[in-house]
């Protein structure tokens, strides 16, 4: 991705993908910077914004992460990924009603979020978000 960015420093997909690579290595702060850059270049790049929100959550910036998730859902109400993320974040912060409401929407849009293997290994959510969603699914 570094080479792609040398050739085209305005490639939002390369920033997002490099952010994903850094997140996979546990370099969350570096990932956040790449996701931010991707969204600066392309403000409507919903998945870069979603990845940014998830990375914020992983770095314990919970309020900021939830605010970003809510903003994404406001703009893209059928974005199952952020509905599921809000479910998890709200559940562990004790906002049960909001968690359940977002889950109805998320599950209605994409049933894969009930499969923790998919969330962990295919979608590759951050560990803290996986734990939070698992707590919701197991009513803990």
Model-identified regions with their sequence ranges:
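Terminal, low-structured helical/coil segments at or just beyond the last alpha-helical repeat
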Residues: 103-140
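Conserved structural position within tetratricopeptide repeats
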Residues: 3-6, 36-40, 70-74, 108
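Conserved alpha-helical positions within TPR/SEL1-like repeat arrays
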Residues: 2, 13-24, 33-35, 47-54, ...
């Amino acid at each position: 991705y570094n080479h792609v960015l040398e050739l085209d420093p305005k490639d939002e997909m390369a920033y997002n993908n490099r952010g994903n690579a850094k997140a996979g290595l546990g370099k969350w702060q570096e990932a956040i910077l790449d996701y931010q850059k991707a969204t600066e270049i392309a403000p409507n790049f919903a998945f870069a914004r979603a990845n940014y929100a998830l990375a914020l959550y992983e770095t314990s910036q919970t309020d900021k992460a939830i605010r970003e998730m809510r903003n994404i859902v406001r703009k893209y109400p059928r974005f199952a990924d952020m509905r599921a993320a809000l479910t998890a974040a709200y559940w562990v912060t004790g906002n049960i009603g909001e968690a359940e409401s977002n889950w109805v929407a998320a599950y209605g849009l994409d049933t894969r979020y009930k499969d923790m293997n998919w969330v962990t290994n295919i979608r590759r959510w951050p560990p803290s978000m996986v734990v939070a969603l698992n707590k919701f699914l197991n009513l803990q």
